[in-house]
């Protein structure tokens, strides 16, 4: 339960917060008014009454991972009072993103991020195949679709599920009305994350683009690839009358063509069980432990494992450098596909920087592909 002293402290610092002054600065400025429960020194401010990670152990303000952060983020005052702990505001200007074409003739990856409401942020990556049309359509319309659903539906998992299905239906209408027959075979992955109040993180995905959270320096996977290798996905394909065939590299494809079992678009494969309904994940952030969220396309995922992604990002000074580092590393490892990364910093950014990086020597250098 949030103490009265903390509530008073947050409220008294409201004006400074509006001026983008960190709560840590307020605490240091007001140290002479500290209650007996807290004591301060010139090196750090300590308080035994707050436990940011739920460990039950006395905590220092530095434990939150935001007080000495190199990214100066203000505090979200209402959520901080609501949840009883400091919640940093995620500034979109600090989000890192990078996209490289690789050895492809065209970059079919798309990405985006935006503030949808005062409480909700949006982050997304789309990896198109069979042309960029489906990825472009999602990039153009998904954000608004989600925004329109938010006032009518409070559950973010439901919002994203409805948005994916609506966008897929809208793309089908668009493709059937178009004179361009290639739109019928255009499709895309979609991995979309919504962050509410700086604490509630919800991710929805179809295809094999991924989202992972770095917690205490370790990767926490928030998505699972939709491929014919999954028993449940393969059974659905067969139930719909489709089949799975393997190419010369041993990669399974739906009807011998598509390397994924869920996507937006791919209208010619809907009858074979390729669906647009996403799988969703909801997680509560702990800014004392959580360094960043990263969204990646398969040009990265098939070459750089999750721990390596965490390590590469943790070595970087800021998220922009990190996004470029991850995409460039995939190129160095031999990917031929488009590579895209979106890096969203959280409270523990920079807290788990390691001096050593463990590399995977079991890496496959076979180029990824959507089509057999």
UniProtKB/Swiss-Prot annotation:
Q: What is this protein called?
A: Protein phosphatase Mn(2+)-dependent 1K
Q: Tell me the PROSITE patterns matching this sequence.
A: PPM_1, PPM_2
User: Which Pfam family, just one, is annotated for this protein?
Assistant: PP2C
State the organism named in the record.
Answer: Mus musculus (Mouse)
Q: List positions binding Mn(2+) 2.
A: 127, 298, 337
Q: Where is the transit peptide?
A: 1-29
According to the UniProt entry, its GO molecular function terms are: [3-methyl-2-oxobutanoate dehydrogenase (lipoamide)]-phosphatase activity; manganese ion binding; protein serine/threonine phosphatase activity
Q: Which UniProt keywords are given for this protein, alphabetically ordered? A: Hydrolase, Manganese, Metal-binding, Mitochondrion, Phosphoprotein, Protein phosphatase, Transit peptide
């Amino acid at each position: 339960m949030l103490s009265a002293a903390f509530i008073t402290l947050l409220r008294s610092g409201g004006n400074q917060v509006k001026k983008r002054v960190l709560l840590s600065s307020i605490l240091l400025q007001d140290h002479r008014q500290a209650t007996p429960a807290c004591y301060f020194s010139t090196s750090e401010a300590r308080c035994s009454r707050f436990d940011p990670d739920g460990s039950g152990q006395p905590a220092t303000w530095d434990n939150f991972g935001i007080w000495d952060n190199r990214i100066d983020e203000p505090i979200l005052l209402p959520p901080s009072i609501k949840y009883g702990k400091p919640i940093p505001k995620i500034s979109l200007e600090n989000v890192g993103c990078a996209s490289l074409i690789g050895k492809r003739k065209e970059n079919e990856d798309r990405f985006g991020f935006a503030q949808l409401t005062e409480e909700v942020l949006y982050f997304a990556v789309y990896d198109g195949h069979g042309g960029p049309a489906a990825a472009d359509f999602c990039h153009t319309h998904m954000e608004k679709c989600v925004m329109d659903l938010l006032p009518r539906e409070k559950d973010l998992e439901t919002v994203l599920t409805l948005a994916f299905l609506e966008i897929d239906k809208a793309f089908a209408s668009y493709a059937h009305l178009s004179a361009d027959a290639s739109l019928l075979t255009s499709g895309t992955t979609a991995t979309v994350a919504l962050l509410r109040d700086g604490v509630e993180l919800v991710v929805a995905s179809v295809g094999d683009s991924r989202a992972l959270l770095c917690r205490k320096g370790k990767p926490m996977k928030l998505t699972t690839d939709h491929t014919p290798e999954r028993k449940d996905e393969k059974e659905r394909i067969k139930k719909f009358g489709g089949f799975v065939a393997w190419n010369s590299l041993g990669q399974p494809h739906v009807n011998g063509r598509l390397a994924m079992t869920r996507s937006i678009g791919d209208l010619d494969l809907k009858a074979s069980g390729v669906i647009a309904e996403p799988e969703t994940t909801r997680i509560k952030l702990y800014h004392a432990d959580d360094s960043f969220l990263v969204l990646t396309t398969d040009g990265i995922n098939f070459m750089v494992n999750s721990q390596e992604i965490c390590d590469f990002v943790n070595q970087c000074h800021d998220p922009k450098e990190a996004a470029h580092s991850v995409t460039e590393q995939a190129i160095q490892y031999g990917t031929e596909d488009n590579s895209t990364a979106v890096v969203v910093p959280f409270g523990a950014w920079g807290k788990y920087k390691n001096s050593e990086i463990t590399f995977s020597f079991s890496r496959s250098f076979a180029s990824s592909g959507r089509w057999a």
